[in-house]
């Protein structure tokens, strides 16, 4: 990475730090970017230099910034936790500990817009992949997709549940995450008992061998 590239990376992180607070008051758009520039002491419209690909780059970059913050928090956790415990800690950190609830609300609303559905799916899928990798998953077969697909459902539903949770220290959200993880583990156990057909078991494919 060039010196300019390193400089821009640091400035983007500073920009995202401001977004994490400003999104509690402002919606996504030019007013938000302008306010973030002011807070960062950037020149007017400097975000066009940092994010030459436009809004999508800012939105996706902000999600990646939150993912990185999640991983930084998880470094402090006990390394010998079980896989389920690691996933629980990761979901708890990502949903509750990174940005205010009002920011989660803004992001959920943003990704529900038809023009942002694909971007939302991409960002959420990336988060779930990082969580599985943090938990130690190294699968590269069908299980790779099924694990991430199941976790994606838990992640999205937990984000929505969190928005209406007014319990002390969001204990109900934590219970919801734990219960949801238990459910997908049961599904995973059932799946392992089901023998999927191999190529040799499918007549039309067997002829091609």
Please provide the spans of the model-predicted regions.
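Short, amphipathic alpha-helix enriched in basic
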Residues: 2, 7-44, 53-64
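Hydrophobic alpha-helical connector segments
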Residues: 9, 72-104
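C-terminal ligand-sensing/allosteric alpha-helical core of TetR-family HTH transcriptional regulators
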Residues: 83-97, 123, 127-134, 180
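Amphipathic alpha-helical segments used for helix-helix packing
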Residues: 97-118, 122
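Amphipathic alpha-helical packing segments from all-alpha helical-bundle domains
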Residues: 115-137, 148-152
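All-alpha amphipathic helical-bundle segments outside canonical DNA-binding/catalytic cores
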Residues: 139-152, 170-173
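Amphipathic C-terminal alpha-helical segment
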Residues: 155-168, 183-191
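Long, charge-rich low-complexity segments
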Residues: 189-209
